[in-house]
Design a protein with these regions (language model features):
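Acidic helix/loop microenvironments that form the catalytic cleft of cell-wall polysaccharide enzymes
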Residues: 118-124
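Conserved nucleotide-sugar donor-binding catalytic segment
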Residues: 1-83
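Short, conserved alpha-helical segments within structured domains
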Residues: 45-46, 115, 162
Length: 179
C-alpha cells in the first residue's frame, strides 16, 4: 500500500485509502484487552481493530512481506459474500460498517469525526463500485473517491457503463480463454 516503511498517522489509519493485510498488523495487546461492543457487533474484525488502536496514536507501516495470506478459502467471509444476493450482502455490509464507524466516532469523543465521515463516504462509494451502481459511481458527490481508484478500475467502469454490450462480450471471451 505504501512504497516505503513509514509512520502512518491515526487519521490515516481511520480514513485509509489503501489496504494492508490484517495478518501484517502488530498491535499492543493492552489495546485489545477491553474491546467495545461495536467490535463484537461488526461482521469483520480487521477494520475495528485498526481504528481502535488508532485512538492511542499513530501506526508504523513496515514495507516488507510480514505474513502469508491464504486466498480463495471457500469458508472465508469474503468468499461468502459472493453467494446468494450479492447486492443485499453489500448493502448489509455497508450498514454494519457504518454503525461501527458511528459507534467508534462516539467512543473516541469525535476526535476523528471528519476522518470517520470520509471513511464512511468512501465505503459507501466502494459498495456502489462493487455492485456496479453507475449512477452513484459517476455522480459528482463521489468525484474525489472516484479519482482515488486506479486507472485500470476507472477504465473498466467507464467501458462497462458506456459500452455494456462490448464489455460483456470482451469479458465473456476473456473468461473463456482463462479456462
Amino acid at each position: 500500500p505504501y512504497e516505503k516503511s513509514m509512520r502512518i498517522t491515526a487519521k490515516e489509519v481511520i480514513n485509509k485509502r489503501t489496504h494492508y493485510p490484517t495478518a501484517s498488523l502488530l498491535l499492543r495487546s493492552e489495546y485489545m484487552k477491553s474491546l467495545p461492543q461495536y467490535y463484537f457487533d461488526c461482521k469483520v474484525g480487521d477494520i475495528p481493530m485498526q481504528i481502535i488502536s488508532a485512538k492511542y496514536g499513530d501506526a508504523y507501516y513496515i514495507d516488507r512481506v510480514m505474513s502469508v495470506y491464504r486466498m480463495g478459502v471457500p469458508t472465508s467471509w469474503t468468499a461468502s459474500q459472493f453467494s446468494g444476493d450479492y447486492k443485499k450482502k453489500q448493502e448489509d455490509y455497508y450498514q454494519n460498517m457504518k454503525r461501527m464507524y458511528e459507534a467508534y466516532d462516539k467512543d473516541s469523543d469525535y476526535r476523528f469525526h471528519s476522518e470517520v465521515e470520509a471513511a464512511k463516504k468512501r465505503l459507501r462509494f466502494l459498495t456502489y463500485v462493487n455492485v456496479r451502481d453507475f449512477k452513484n459511481i459517476l455522480s459528482k458527490r463521489y468525484k474525489n473517491e472516484y479519482k482515488e481508484l486506479d486507472f485500470r478500475e476507472r477504465f473498466f467502469i467507464k467501458f462497462e457503463y458506456f459500452l455494456p454490450g462490448v464489455y460483456n462480450l470482451v469479458r465473456k471471451t476473456a473468461l473463456s480463454l482463462k479456462k
